[in-house]
From Swiss-Prot:
Residues 209-218 are annotated as: Important for the catalytic mechanism of both phosphorylation and dephosphorylation. This is HPr kinase/phosphorylase. It comes from Delftia acidovorans (strain DSM 14801 / SPH-1). The gene is hprK. Belongs to the HPrK/P family. The active site is at H146, K167, D185, R252. Residues 273-278 are annotated as: Important for the catalytic mechanism of dephosphorylation.
């Protein structure tokens, strides 16, 4: 799922301070938006912004020093024709960067065609980088999953499982062990590129953890600023199951690593059985450490299989 296209006035207000831009033309087109077909067909929101280019319609066009020179340094007829061609691109917004002054023909065209134009003294490359990062996030595929999302040993870990298995209590214990809370109960997940999922907490639930019998806890107020995180990249899913589910649906030693599809991206997954007396927090941290080793190319299970094969070839007995 992707959100609806963003309007010119929302984009302007979002970066009014950071890009220090002014609205210099097309003031009556504040509701102008990105083309919906262009948004759906774009591989990423980053594809929706770039330097002035006549073969890429429907995207936010940035005009720096070279682009303004191209529009200005020609015969009056050629300059008029080059400016007029911009209308055929149907840009949602034009951004004048590098402290350039817009040619009168460009200003007039924006007013006639109802195209918003912003002006900033920031470098054009910087403007493009900022807008690409913002649009990539804004138009990213997204979903919401139930669970506790945490920073455990520097890795983004989503703890999932049936209701009543103690996910929030586990999250609280992990916080006391020096880890950080991102979100409890509802986790907003975004695919920010082809291989990366980023998660954060809905604003309404920020810093909150619900523990049955106690109620809502403000983790930031109780444990301090370092006990919470604003966002993390999802690298591991820890799924809690009951004993009967573990015995019925999962192998004790799976031959291949488990993964779960999240927004089209396979995410590593481990399954932990919840029974009385087990220290689940220690098991979760051990699973995270093992996942870190696997990311570094160290697979304990495969090393054991190779060790076992060599022993069999030597004829060793066990």
């Amino acid at each position: 799922m992707r959100p609806s296209a963003i309007s010119a006035d929302v984009l302007f207000e979002e970066f009014r301070s950071s890009l220090r831009w002014e609205w210099v033309a097309g003031l009556g087109a504040s509701e102008r938006r990105f083309d919906e077909m262009a948004v759906r067909s774009a591989r990423s929101g980053a594809d929706l912004v770039g330097y002035l280019n006549y073969i890429h319609p429907y995207r936010l066009q940035v005009l720096g020093e070279r682009e303004i020179a191209y529009l200005s340094n020609a015969t009056p007829q050629d300059c008029q024709r080059r400016v007029a061609r911009i209308v055929t691109l149907e840009p949602p917004v034009l951004v004048l960067a590098d402290g350039q002054t817009a040619p009168e023909a460009l200003l007039s065209m924006c007013e006639r065609a109802h195209i918003p134009m912003f002006s900033t003294r920031e470098q054009s490359a910087f403007v493009i980088d900022v807008l690409r990062a913002y649009l990539a996030k804004h138009f990213a595929d997204r979903t919401t999953m139930h669970g506790v999302f945490m920073d455990i040993l520097g890795m983004g870990v989503l703890i999932t499982g049936e209701s009543g298995l103690g996910k929030s209590e586990l999250g609280l214990e992990l916080v006391t062990r020096g880890n950080g809370l991102v979100a409890d109960d509802a986790v907003d997940l975004y695919r920010i590129n082809q291989t990366t999922i980023e998660g954060k907490c809905p604003e309404l639930l920020q810093n909150l953890l619900e523990v049955r019998g106690i109620g809502l806890l403000d983790i930031r107020a109780i444990f301090g600023e370092t006990a919470v995180r604003r966002k993390m990249r999802l690298k591991l899913i820890v799924h809690l199951v009951r004993k009967e589910t573990m015995e019925r649906e999962y192998e004790r030693l799976p031959a291949e690593p488990l993964t779960q599809d999240v927004l089209g991206v396979p995410v590593r997954k481990v399954v932990i059985q919840v029974v009385a007396g087990r220290n689940i927090a220690v098991l979760v941290e051990a699973a995270v450490r093992n996942a870190i080793l696997q990311l570094r190319g160290i697979d304990t299970y495969q090393e054991f299989v190779q060790r076992h094969r060599r022993a069999m070839e030597r004829g060793d007995t066990f």
